[in-house]
């Protein structure tokens, strides 16, 4: 696939207008703002750096890498294994809902707009348990999108969604959100290089996280009195 063709797909799939419902999730940021942990641009940037290094950014990136490699090898048993690990390691119910809900919606949209037998084969069996990182990795592999480009687009889109939620919640000005997005580009590139330096077949070695406060905020969000977001 040409670079231009891959770029067009990624701009569609990870656009804010792509129908995965990303705007309905805050990944626990809503409670983090409520209790004062996230209250200005600097605290938001630090929080999101942590999510990339030790939280969902790293976790979904590992799943993307494992799924991409399994799909390229057409090893459907390995792809199933990645999915099972993804389901088992979700720290909270709402974070599981966030990944599964977006993954299912992404799968449906890609099947409709960019049908491919690999995506169809996997989607028919596991559509109800479709982690976001897994289905995006599968779609990129199926359509010949270079892995580094696809993984970078996934992480950039996740960060953009978190920033969008925080801009509305804190609230922050749009310019502050732009500054955070720009500042995190280096973190995204570092994470992509680190993940792709490991063999995809050994993805289990990279699984895990240490974003305890983000997970605590997700747990507290379940019983938060006033909520704008689903997570």
Swiss-Prot record:
GO terms for molecular function: nickel cation binding. The keyword DNA repair does not apply. GO terms for cellular component: cytoplasm. It is found in: Cytoplasm. InterPro entries: UreF, UreF_sf. HAMAP family: UreF (MF_01385). Required for maturation of urease via the functional incorporation of the urease nickel metallocenter. This is Urease accessory protein UreF. It comes from Magnetococcus marinus (strain ATCC BAA-1437 / JCM 17883 / MC-1).
């Amino acid at each position: 696939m040409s670079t231009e063709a891959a770029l067009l797909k990624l701009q569609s799939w990870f656009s804010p207008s792509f129908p995965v419902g990303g705007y309905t999730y805050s990944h626990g940021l809503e409670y983090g703002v409520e209790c004062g942990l996230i209250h200005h641009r600097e605290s938001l940037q630090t929080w999101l750096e942590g999510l990339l290094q030790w939280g969902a950014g790293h976790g979904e990136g590992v799943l993307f890498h494992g799924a991409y490699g399994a799909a390229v090898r057409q090893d459907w048993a390995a792809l199933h294994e990645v999915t099972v690990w993804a389901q088992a390691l979700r720290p909270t119910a709402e974070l599981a809902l966030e990944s599964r809900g977006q993954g299912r919606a992404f799968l449906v949209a890609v099947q409709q707009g960019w049908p491919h037998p690999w995506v169809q084969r996997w989607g028919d069996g596991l559509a109800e348990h479709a982690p976001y990182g897994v289905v995006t990795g599968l779609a990129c592999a199926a359509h010949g999108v270079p892995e580094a480009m696809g993984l970078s687009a996934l992480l950039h889109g996740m960060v953009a969604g978190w920033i969008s939620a925080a801009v509305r919640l804190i609230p922050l000005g749009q310019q502050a959100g732009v500054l955070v997005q720009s500042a995190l580009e280096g973190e995204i590139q570092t994470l992509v290089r680190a993940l792709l330096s490991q063999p995809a077949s050994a993805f289990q070695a990279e699984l895990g996280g240490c974003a305890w406060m983000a997970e605590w905020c997700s747990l507290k969000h379940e019983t938060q009195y006033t909520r704008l977001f689903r997570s």
